[in-house]
Design a protein with these regions (language model features):
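Membrane-targeting and insertion segments and their boundary/processing signals
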Residues: 9, 53-59, 86, 90
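A generic structural signal for ordered alpha-helices
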Residues: 13, 60-63, 94-95
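Short alpha-helix capping/helix-loop boundary micro-motifs
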Residues: 2-8
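Loop/turn positions that initiate beta-strands
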Residues: 9, 14-16
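Compact nucleic-acid interaction/catalytic patches
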Residues: 27-72
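C-terminal terminal-subdomain/extension
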Residues: 69-135
Length: 135
């Protein structure tokens, strides 16, 4: 049984949800990206990208490794880039979910999410407001 799109959108706009975005919908790339929701407010859904490799020019501690063995929906072990966040208007996020621009992928388990939140709270590349999204 498939969930109604509005319910799916609300579920996948909460902390720990992972969605796949279409090419160039959030990040300018030649391929779609996995986005991890780290915070939802009344007006924003704050996300980080999930990558197959670490960025060499960013601190390793700001890119926690997430294991496929603990998150079955991942294709391989991955890295969350806590140093770059995307604050998306909540209505735009939900609209993108309903139109299929964002597609639900899965939910991070609690241990993986704890690693991400810790990395974001201490990330030296973020200001205090941005770090607070991870609390």
């Amino acid at each position: 049984m498939e969930l109604p799109k509005d319910l799916t959108g609300r579920l996948y706009s909460e902390r720990g949800a992972v969605v796949h975005s279409e090419v160039n919908s959030v990040i300018k790339t030649d391929h779609g990206k996995y986005l991890l929701v780290v915070k939802k407010t009344e007006s924003l859904v704050v996300c980080c990208s999930v990558n197959s490799e670490r960025y060499r020019f960013k601190p390793e501690e700001s890119q926690p490794k997430i294991l496929k063995s603990e998150n079955d929906f991942l294709h391989h072990d991955s890295f969350v880039d806590c140093a770059q966040i995307f604050a998306i208007d909540v209505n735009v996020f939900l609209n993108n979910m309903s139109k299929g621009v964002f597609v639900p992928v899965g939910l991070f388990n609690e241990i993986s999410m704890a690693f991400v939140l810790r990395a974001g709270q201490t990330c030296p590349m973020l200001n205090k407001v941005e770090q607070s999204y991870f609390k």
